[in-house]
């Protein structure tokens, strides 16, 4: 039984793809017109899609007419990849390929010496690789320096013009004490209600040149006596007539120059501090590299000085001087009172400043008005401000005595 002729013609009909349907024929150039072709586009036309090198012994697929090197496409078919690497058309075997000597002749016409072309390509690749590596290294270094400078500018805030290298850790904006006269004025101002009589005793070493924390607290201790706090007032004298930066242990190296200043409000913990004990709000301005331990030690020293000043202010002229009224006009009664002071009540010892430690007080922060968080003593104020606060107003901290200082 024979197949009808129309059925045979239908099976041989070539089905055009959408791309082929929209193709338009190009007119052949018959004159001597020359067209400039860039080496990059020419190389892409003469390149094997498998090895990305110039075609060698060109083989063309019979169905999709894509060109490959003979070794490349044969190796691909032997590995079991029975499809065109470019368009995924099915390739049964080597019988689906045909040689393309015309394309090899075209390549030979453009590049007569293939060995010279390959040597030139190797030299170009080596030079490009070397220049690219150097340029990448220099650009990476420049980018790193630029990023470091940007982060440094964001983190370091320049201090105000005319400010001291170490900020005063006393409250307010008062002038530092300049000598004994200033210390006496502060002491007299802090105790306006005291009865006239002998001037209150001043601790030794409170002269104009005293700047140590242990013995030079007399000029500043009186500023916090009674209910009025020197930290919240305008009489902002500093310890020992000098300035009080972050306290540091004896023998420690001097602190670096501050990159910026931080203002903070120091309040007693509303839950852990009993009312009336020392419910003073302190306004402190210090450097950003001061740590939480510095604040704790400053607070312990400050409160010890306040208690010492209160005891000195309320203390009489002598332990037993008020008990004798038989003294002569030359003030001998005072000496008898002192001599007989053993019979009166024993005077309480003044608080010592030698045992002051940063472990006596714990610093807390309540970010966003939430729960209180205990701050680690090694954290700097700049890090606390960036990590917990993140608002453009003075840093607010709370303090409370440590339950079990060690």
UniProtKB/Swiss-Prot annotation:
Extent of Gly residues compositional bias: 214-228, 235-244, 317-343
Principal location class: nucleus
Database matches in InterPro entries: RAWUL, RING1/RING2, RING1_RING-HC, Znf_RING, Znf_RING/FYVE/PHD, Znf_RING_CS
Necessary for interaction with CBX2 as annotated region, ranges: 230-406
Region (Necessary for transcriptional repression): 30-234
Reactions catalysed: S-ubiquitinyl-[E2 ubiquitin-conjugating enzyme]-L-cysteine + [acceptor protein]-L-lysine = [E2 ubiquitin-conjugating enzyme]-L-cysteine + N(6)-ubiquitinyl-[acceptor protein]-L-lysine
Biased composition (Pro residues): 246-258
Enzyme Commission numbers on file: 2.3.2.27
Phosphoserine, modified sites: 38, 140, 187, 190, 229, 232, 248, 254
Keyword Transcription regulation applies: yes
Composition bias, Acidic residues: 175-187
Organism superkingdom: Eukaryota
Top enzyme category: transferase
Entries under PANTHER family matching the protein: E3 UBIQUITIN-PROTEIN LIGASE RING1 (PTHR46076:SF2), E3 UBIQUITIN-PROTEIN LIGASE RING1 / RING 2 FAMILY MEMBER (PTHR46076)
Subunit structure: Component of chromatin-associated Polycomb (PcG) complexes. Part of the E2F6.com-1 complex in G0 phase composed of E2F6, MGA, MAX, TFDP1, CBX3, BAT8, EUHMTASE1, RING1, RNF2/RING2 MBLR, L3MBTL2 and YAF2. Interacts with CBX2 and PCGF6. Component of a PRC1-like complex. Component of repressive BCOR complex containing Polycomb group subcomplex at least composed of RYBP, PCGF1, BCOR and RNF2/RING2. Interacts with PHC2, PCGF2, RNF2; CBX6, CBX7 and CBX8. Interacts with BMI1. Interacts with MN1. Interacts with USP26.
Protein name: E3 ubiquitin-protein ligase RING1
Gene that specifies this protein: Ring1
